[in-house]
Amino acid sequence: MSARGRVIVITGAMAAGKSTVADLLTMRLPKSVHIHGETFRRMVLNGRADMTPNPSPDAIAQLNMRYDLAAMTADRFSEEGFDAIVQDVILGKDLADFVKRIDSPERYLVVLSPSLSALEWQEEQRAKAGYVHLSAGALDEVLRRENAKIGYWLDCSSQTPEETVEDILANLDKAAV
C-alpha cells in the first residue's frame, strides 16, 4: 500500500479560477485526482434544491451531503496514496466545518481571493453559467466577510493560472489546516 496522500482544498467565489487552478495543480502532482464538488450537485436529476440567498432546508441538506461526499471521496483517494484536490465553493462557517470533515492528516486549504474587479471580468468571460441565483460579487462578499481566516488566502488577480499553481506549491506549508 502506498503512503497516504494529501488532501488539498481549493475554494473561492464563483469565477475565482478554482476549476482551472485545480486541474493544473492536479496535473502537476504525480499521483492525483481532481474532485469537483459541483459534480455531486449535478448528480441529482430529480428533486434537486439549489442554493439561493434564502436557501430551503432541502437545499442546505443537499449542500451538506455534497460536502460530505467530497470529503469522503478525498479521504478514500488519500488512503490509496493519491493527492486529492477538492474544488468547490465553500463559504462562511461551512469552510471550517468542511475542513473538519476531512480525516487525512495532511490537509491543506487554499482560498483563491482575487479582487472584485478581477472576479467580475472573469465572470463576463466565462462560457459556463455558475450559480443562477448568486453573483460572483455576492459570493465574494460572503467569502471575505464570513469565512474563517484559515489556510492560504491567495490574491491571484495578477497571476496566470500557471503562476497561481506555482504560488500554491511554493506556499503549501502556509495552507496546512
Please describe what each predicted stretch is:
Residues 10:
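Hydrophobic anchor at the beta1->P-loop junction of P-loop NTPases
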Residues 61-104:
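Glycine-rich phosphate-binding loop used to anchor ATP phosphates in small-molecule kinases
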Residues 88, 103-123, 154:
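Conserved phosphate-donor/acceptor-positioning beta-strand/loop module used by diverse small-molecule
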Residues 16:
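ATP-binding Walker
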Residues 125-170, 174-177:
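Small-molecule kinase domains that catalyze NTP-dependent phosphoryl transfer to phosphate-bearing small molecules
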Residues 19:
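Walker A/P-loop
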Residues 13:
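P-loop (Walker A) phosphate-binding loop of NTP-binding proteins
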